[in-house]
């Protein structure tokens, strides 16, 4: 059994408590930290796997840093690392100590299992390496933008994103909650004003694939309640104060 906590919007889940539950109920943990590269939990970088078996990061173009596509999986378990390395490259090994029969020569390899072609190119890796040097600056800039949103939206009829005291969010997103009855009106008005708002996310169990597996509306009421009023405001390091003020004025007008 595996539990996959998602560090939504860049803020870490309470991994210490989830880890305690894993010991009680006997499940493994894979952290989905796609939003949280550069974030911290209990003062330590997200991805250190103190409370999990594996942590995954996404480097999709809209994430905090990018390699154009792809990502990484981190672990402190040598056996898991070796298995992931094998699966990444078609399940092939050139390590004679892992082969099931003697090697024919230095050219020899064996496919031990049916893996995947998940190899990142050198060019993609170089792009990621160049960006990771600026990761702390990117996250710091996102925090300044979020603090400004917090201050200027405090008097509006919106619920601001919760920030946990033991998590330093990477602030991949800045999602607010509006009156569900006004969400479509607000979203449409902001889009018509040229502001790239979005909704993160449609609950997974409402997608046809999962409905075909037996999931139904009402089974996850908190997710559905959150979705009903969710709108994500623009959040990226190069967002200027002038543009941010435009977003805030448009949101204020749309809420009237």
List where the protein language model places each region.
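PLP-dependent aminotransferase class I/II
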Residues: 2-6, 11-19, 24, 40, ...
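Acidic active-site catalytic centers that drive phospho-/nucleotidyl reactions
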Residues: 31-32, 69, 122, 234
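Short hydrophobic "helix-edge" motifs at membrane interfaces and signal-peptide entry regions
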Residues: 22-23, 48-51, 66-68, 224-225
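Conserved PLP phosphate-binding loop immediately N-terminal to the Schiff-base lysine helix
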Residues: 2-18, 27-58, 64
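Active-site PLP attachment segment
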Residues: 50-94
């Amino acid at each position: 059994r595996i539990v996959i906590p998602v560090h939504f919007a860049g803020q870490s889940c309470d991994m210490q408590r989830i880890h305690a539950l894993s010991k009680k109920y006997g499940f493994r943990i894979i952290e989905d930290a796609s939003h949280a590269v550069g974030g911290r939990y209990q003062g330590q970088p997200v991805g250190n796997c103190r409370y999990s078996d594996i942590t995954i990061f996404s480097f999709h173009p809209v994430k905090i840093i990018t390699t154009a596509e792809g990502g990484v999986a981190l672990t402190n378990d040598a056996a898991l690392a070796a298995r992931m390395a094998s699966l990444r490259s078609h399940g092939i090994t050139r390590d004679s100590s892992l082969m099931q029969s003697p090697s024919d020569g230095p050219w020899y390899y064996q496919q031990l299992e049916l893996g995947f072609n998940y190899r990142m190119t050198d060019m993609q890796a170089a792009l990621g390496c160049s960006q990771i040097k600026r990761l702390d600056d990117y996250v710091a800039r996102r925090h300044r933008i979020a603090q400004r949103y917090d201050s200027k939206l405090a008097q509006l009829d919106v619920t601001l994103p919760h920030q946990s005291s033991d998590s330093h969010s990477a602030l991949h997103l800045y999602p607010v909650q509006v009156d569900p009855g006004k969400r479509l009106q607000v979203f449409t008005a902001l889009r018509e004003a040229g502001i790239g708002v979005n909704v993160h996310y449609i609950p997974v169990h409402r997608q046809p694939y999962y409905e075909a597996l037996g999931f139904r509306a009402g089974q996850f009421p908190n997710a559905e309640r959150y979705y009903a009023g969710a709108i994500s405001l623009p959040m990226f390091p190069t967002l200027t104060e002038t543009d941010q003020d435009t977003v805030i004025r448009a949101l204020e007008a749309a809420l009237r």
